[in-house]
């Protein structure tokens, strides 16, 4: 019986700790650079809500727009990814070399997701195809 209570207590503590890692914040609590990015590419009135997540030392931010777009920022407000679900990622966010490549090689599709990884950039097209580029925007490969 003591073991069961100990396990239950551990589970409750774990759930409580996890709950504190993610919470809704005011738009004005975003880093200034993230606010500028949102204002540049959409209307602040389109923001549904903002979440702050804390997985490690630094928080990360997720901005959810009313049209189901999700924009992720690091603790400094640098863009990490934008997922527009089924609509095109706004122009000006993605490097021109990548948008030109997609227009030339995939003219019937558009970019719905853009992610900045540690050593590469990744885009997902409206047909589900994922393309990998180097940090300068040169095509590397199709992701499996």
Give short role names for the model-derived ranges.
Residues 20-144:
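Interaction-mediating elements
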């Amino acid at each position: 019986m003591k073991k069961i209570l100990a396990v239950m207590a551990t589970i409750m503590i774990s759930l409580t700790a996890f709950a504190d890692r993610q919470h809704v914040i005011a738009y004005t609590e975003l880093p200034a650079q993230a606010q500028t990015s949102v204002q540049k590419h959409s209307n602040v009135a389109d923001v549904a809500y903002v979440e702050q997540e804390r997985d490690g030392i630094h928080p990360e931010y997720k901005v959810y727009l009313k049209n189901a777009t999700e924009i992720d920022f690091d603790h400094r407000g640098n863009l990490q990814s934008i997922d527009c679900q089924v609509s095109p990622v706004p122009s000006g966010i993605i490097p021109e070399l990548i948008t030109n490549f997609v227009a030339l090689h995939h003219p019937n599709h558009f970019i719905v997701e853009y992610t900045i990884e540690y050593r590469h950039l990744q885009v997902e097209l409206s047909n589900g195809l994922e393309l990998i580029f180097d940090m300068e925007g040169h095509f590397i490969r199709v992701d499996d």
